[in-house]
Amino acid sequence: CTYCMAEDMQFLPKKDILSLEEIEDICRIFIKLGTRKIRLTGGEPLVRKGIMQVINNLGEEVGNYLDELTITTNGSQLEFKAEELYNAGVRRINVSLDHLDPDKFREITRWGDLEKVKRGLDKAREVGLKIKINTVAISNFNQNHLAEILRWCGKENFDMTIIEVMPMGDIGGDKR
């Protein structure tokens, strides 16, 4: 989204990014140290090739050494991954959604297919995932629509968290 990533952001070289094995190893170390809840976030974790194997492996610990395995996602892959997530032991997801207007949604996400995300949310609910919507409050963008999102979440029986923008350095000159 525009508030997280500048248009001309330079990505790390692949060799500098944690491998899936390293991610799983770190999670297992935390579990051995007594961590009871693991949340996988991103970027967008569900587009990472091979991530479902990590989720399946960590999901084997749910009910034993792990109380909860959750995913924070932009929702773009839920339509196709929700059932697999549930079967892997995920019971709750957080979905980032900052506007209910399709054009505004596309503007903030840069890819935005709000209807695809909504279909994914429907699928997630259908398979039994508990859903929390994360909405970043952005002045001059969605501050007058937060109540609308809250009402929609209530109607859909989704939990909602309103998040304040956290300045993370230069994100392309955006003043949010």
Segments and roles (model prediction):
Residues 2-69:
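Conserved alpha-helical substructure of the radical SAM core
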Residues 9-11, 45-47, 75-80, 91, ...:
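Conserved radical SAM core fold
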Residues 14-18, 22, 109-113, 141:
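Alpha-helix N-cap and loop-to-helix initiation/capping positions
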Residues 23, 51, 78, 117, ...:
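Aromatic/hydrophobic pocket-lining residues that form the small-molecule binding cavity
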Residues 33-39, 65-70, 91-92, 97, ...:
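Conserved C-terminal portion of the radical SAM core fold
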Residues 77-88, 150-151:
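Short amphipathic alpha-helices and their capping/turn segments at secondary-structure boundaries
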